[in-house]
């Protein structure tokens, strides 16, 4: 390749990479998504909701054995595209109990727009609830599960959705009675751009 052409193209590539952070999202829109933006202290309950019309696209967490084998959490949200429209209803799902493995998707074809959690000293674990929002009568399809986050118990966790066409619908978790920690697999789905008749897919 001609070096002159390379020097002309390099600033353009660098600018595009800086604008999108390599993730398919404008990185600057992740507000407070850093090490000092935790939504909880260790052993503390929390409730986190995305602003209206936004859904969770990133989850970050750090583990502390000495602080009750607990984690601090942080989330990032992004607005949904105009093709989905506005949320027509939002709700808290059923509680997933501490000390147990669980699998849960938002009911009623909802998308994850928040998390709520409470810590239990007796089991050194948390119970969890999803905050879900439904968008008209849109239905999920082409669903898949992410790899495990974190890769090993006790490690830091940093899950970012790389594809704007996929939305978080839920998760499945394992629980280690020895490590007192969880591994998460997030359920990601596309959503139809038209209404459908299925009430819960």
From Swiss-Prot:
InterPro entries, alphabetized: Dermatopontin
Post-translational modification: Sulfated on tyrosine residue(s).
Residues annotated with Pyrrolidone carboxylic acid modification: 19
One term under GO cellular component: extracellular region
Induction: Induced by cell quiescence.
Region (3 X 6 AA tandem repeats of D-R-[EQ]-W-[NQK]-[FY]): 70-186
Pfam families in UniProt: DERM
Sulfotyrosine, modified sites: 23, 162, 164, 167, 194
Keywords: Cell adhesion, Disulfide bond, Extracellular matrix, Pyrrolidone carboxylic acid, Repeat, Secreted, Signal, Sulfation
GO terms for biological process, alphabetical: cell adhesion; collagen fibril organization; negative regulation of cell population proliferation
Sequence repeat residue numbers: 26-79, 70-75, 80-135, 125-130, 181-186
Extent of the signal sequence: 1-18
Quaternary structure (record): Interacts with TGFB1, DCN and collagen.
Protein family per UniProt: Belongs to the dermatopontin family.
Protein name: Dermatopontin
Organism of this sequence: Mus musculus
